[in-house]
């Protein structure tokens, strides 16, 4: 018989940098999970990813205090900022443009996000990423 699920915990943790301090410690401590076991497993799984990149993770906690977790791809906004070489998006995206990004870079980001996005095809995903870029104050160049 399958294990009984006690809770789902959603967090964003820096790749390769999970430690028992907030937000990881309190979120998992409330569920009675072995925090260090999660930190070691997460850091081992994300060691191939650029260190410090925020990685969304969904942790399934079972009634016997065991857990499994699924890592997702970094948020589109983080990938866009990295590709454009900017620190943050624009406070007024329609007036103040903070950088430029090419359509090829958008397609590359869409390919990266393809595993997590539910878009019908790569073109639809690219358009979705393009909308995120525009809302951040980035100019999309052909």
From Swiss-Prot:
CDD domains, alphabetized: Ribosomal_L11 (cd00349)
Under the heading InterPro entries, the entry gives:
Ribosomal_uL11, Ribosomal_uL11_bac-typ, Ribosomal_uL11_C, Ribosomal_uL11_C_sf, Ribosomal_uL11_CS, Ribosomal_uL11_N, Ribosomal_uL11_N_sf
One GO process term, biological-process aspect: translation
Write the record's keywords in alphabetical order, separated by commas. Methylation, Ribonucleoprotein, Ribosomal protein, RNA-binding, rRNA-binding
Question: Is Cell wall biogenesis/degradation given among the entry's keywords?
Answer: no
Give a short account of its post-translational modification: One or more lysine residues are methylated.
UniProt cross-references to Pfam families, sorted A to Z: Ribosomal_L11, Ribosomal_L11_N
* Gene Ontology cellular-component terms listed: cytosolic large ribosomal subunit
- One MF term in GO for this entry? large ribosomal subunit rRNA binding
Task: Please describe what this protein does.
Answer: Forms part of the ribosomal stalk which helps the ribosome interact with GTP-bound translation factors.
Q: Which PANTHER family match?
A: 60S RIBOSOMAL PROTEIN L12, LARGE RIBOSOMAL SUBUNIT PROTEIN UL11M
Q: Self-association or partners: how does it assemble?
A: Part of the ribosomal stalk of the 50S ribosomal subunit. Interacts with L10 and the large rRNA to form the base of the stalk. L10 forms an elongated spine to which L12 dimers bind in a sequential fashion forming a multimeric L10(L12)X complex.
Q: Which family does it belong to?
A: Belongs to the universal ribosomal protein uL11 family.
NCBIfam families per UniProt: L11_bact (TIGR01632)
What is this protein called in UniProt?
Answer: Large ribosomal subunit protein uL11
Tell me the organism.
Citrobacter koseri (strain ATCC BAA-895 / CDC 4225-83 / SGSC4696)
Q: Which gene encodes it?
A: rplK
